[in-house]
């Protein structure tokens, strides 16, 4: 009787999981199929799930700079995402280590402030950031967006990295100090390598936030040559002669870097999240 209950429970679980996957993946499947349909077939009054005539014209179009400067937008997004992520992780290492290892006045207040940040929406920072960026004279530049993305991701980076550093035994660093290493040497020779899975997790998080950002990019960038992919895609959607297949192709190619990055770093992300959630 107990075996039958377990079997039924397992069947129900896998059926529910299959239904969830179908609901989740079906829109992406439709996007993929639409990207292979011709312009007229994509808006047909009698749509089909699979293309009647397969075509790669939309993928060719998005890489044609005369039609859509996808490569330029991709480069801008890549520069902003990589640079802001590297800066956020580097500063996060220093801040997280200080909160995890050093004892100083106001430490708990600073630590609590990182929790408080999560209570506020990012849009509340638009006005102060806009004033700072215009005062610095970097409006409509990649640097403006890099600074904004670091501002957005740094609190989370510090919060997550502190959890990882808390799992590293103090005895390891004490032994290193006895061998003559200073604080910076300990951080980059011992602490950082031991927390590498956590660093990769934080980098992927920061990269995804910067790569997918539309709000700040649409406010701080005005020249088409500086657009990132989210803003560029919105411009593509706003054209009067929009072509659904081209939009779906551009959207899918835009999502590929994040998907590939997550797939390659999945093992590190899982181990990093596990390590960061356990104290000891």
From Swiss-Prot:
The keyword Transport applies. InterPro entries: BP-dep_ABC_trans_perm, MetI-like, MetI-like_sf. It is found in: Cell inner membrane. It comes from the Bacteria. It holds the Pfam family BPD_transp_1. Residues 74-265 form the ABC transmembrane type-1 domain. This is Inner membrane ABC transporter permease protein YcjP. It comes from Escherichia coli (strain K12).
